[in-house]
A protein has these predicted regions:
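C-terminal accessory segments enriched in acidic
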Residues: 1-19, 23-29, 84-86, 153, ...
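Active-site/substrate-binding loop(s) of hydrolase catalytic cores
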Residues: 50, 65, 72-73, 77-211
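Short beta-strand-to-loop junctions in surface cap/lid or active-site-entrance loops
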Residues: 42-51
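Conserved beta-strand elements of the Class I
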Residues: 52-55, 265
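Conserved strand-to-helix beginnings and helix N-cap segments that scaffold or border functional pockets
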Residues: 67-68, 278
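Active-site histidine-acidic residue metal-binding/catalytic motifs
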Residues: 57-62
Length: 291
C-alpha cells in the first residue's frame, strides 16, 4: 500500500462539495476555516442526528492516502444512506446516522498535503515558501503546515510544551479551525485516522476515572472489530519522555479529551492493509452502534 496521495487537494474539496449537492436532504457541506496559505478546510456532515462524531485525517503529509480514502468513504456512506443499505450485513447506515451524524474532515492540513504532492513550489505565500526552502527538509512525508508547524503538537492541552522558540499553543489557523468546530458542535466523540502498525490509542484524563473507563470501553469495542492493538494514551502524571516531553501533549485527541470531555481515539491503520476503506467505513459505524 503506497502512502502517496492520489488526489489533489482540490479533488477532495470538490468531492465533498458535490456529495452535499447530490444528497442535500441529509448532508451539509461547510468550510470550517482556512490554512495559512489560504486553502479552505472542508467538512461534510452526514445524517440528521443531534449529536455528531468527528472523523478527521490529514494532519500530516505522512498520512498519505488516508485523506483520499476518508473522502471516498464519506461519499460511499452517503450512497449507503440514500439507498437504505446495510454495511457488512450488520450496520444500518441510515438508522445509525440519524441517531448520531458524522462530521468528516479528510484534510485538515491542505498546505502540507499539497507540499507532499508537489514540493515547496506549491506554497503561494513567498515568505512561507522561502522559509520552508531554507529549512532544507525533504517534502516526502512532510509533517507540517505552510509555516513549518506540526499541527499534531499545536493544541492547548495541559502541560503543553513548545517545540520551537516563539511557538504558542493554537498559533495556527488550522488548529483554531478545529478548536472552533469542536466547541460549536455538540459531539459524542473524536476519531482521528492515520498510518502506523495497526493500533487504537485512547486518550485519558488525569482525574477522570469515569471518562477513562468509558473511553476504554469504546476503544475495546473498536479493537475487537478491527483486531488492532490497544494502547493507552499518556497523561502528564504518567511521566515524561527521555527528552522531557510527552507525545500526547499538544495533540488534538488530548485537547478534545480535556476540554470537550468526550471519548477521543487515534486510529492508526497499517500501511500494508489491503482494505483501508472497509476499516474507515466500519469503525465510525461501530462507534455509534456502541454508544
Amino acid at each position: 500500500m503506497e502512502t502517496v496521495q492520489e488526489k489533489t487537494y482540490e479533488n477532495i474539496y470538490y468531492l465533498l462539495w458535490e456529495a452535499a449537492q447530490r444528497y442535500q436532504k441529509f448532508t451539509q457541506f461547510r468550510v470550517i476555516g482556512k490554512s495559512h496559505d489560504d486553502r479552505m478546510i472542508p467538512m461534510l456532515e452526514i445524517g440528521t442526528g443531534d449529536l455528531c462524531i468527528f472523523c478527521i485525517a490529514g494532519f500530516s503529509g505522512t498520512d498519505g492516502q488516508m485523506s483520499d480514502r476518508l473522502a471516498e468513504t464519506a461519499v460511499e456512506l452517503c450512497r449507503n444512506y440514500e439507498c437504505g443499505w446495510t454495511v457488512q450485513e450488520f450496520y444500518e447506515v441510515r438508522k445509525l446516522l440519524d441517531q448520531t451524524r458524522l462530521c468528516i474532515i479528510p484534510v485538515v492540513n491542505p498546505d502540507g498535503y499539497e507540499i507532499c504532492r508537489k514540493g515547496y513550489g506549491t506554497v503561494r505565500n513567498p515568505i512561507f515558501r522561502q522559509m520552508l526552502k531554507m529549512q532544507d527538509r525533504p517534502t516526502d512525508g512532510f509533517p507540517c503546515n505552510a509555516r513549518g508547524i506540526e499541527l499534531k503538537q499545536n493544541f492547548p492541552t495541559n502541560y503543553y510544551q513548545r517545540q520551537k522558540i516563539h511557538q504558542e499553543p493554537a498559533s495556527e489557523n488550522e488548529t483554531r479551525a478545529l478548536i472552533g468546530i469542536f466547541q460549536e458542535y455538540k459531539s459524542a466523540g473524536l476519531l482521528t485516522f492515520g498510518y502506523s502498525h495497526g493500533k487504537i490509542i485512547y486518550s485519558r484524563q488525569e482525574k477522570g476515572f469515569a471518562y477513562n473507563q468509558r473511553n476504554y470501553r469504546l476503544a475495546r469495542y473498536l479493537q475487537k472489530c478491527s483486531g488492532y492493538r490497544l494502547e493507552k494514551g499518556k497523561t502528564a502524571s504518567g511521566g515524561l519522555g527521555s527528552k522531557g516531553n510527552n507525545p500526547d501533549m499538544g495533540s488534538p485527541e488530548q485537547f478534545y479529551a480535556e476540554v470537550i470531555r468526550q471519548p477521543s481515539l487515534a486510529i492508526e491503520i497499517p500501511v500494508s492493509h489491503r482494505d483501508i476503506m472497509k476499516e474507515i467505513r466500519q469503525l465510525p459505524l461501530e462507534y455509534i452502534y456502541s454508544l
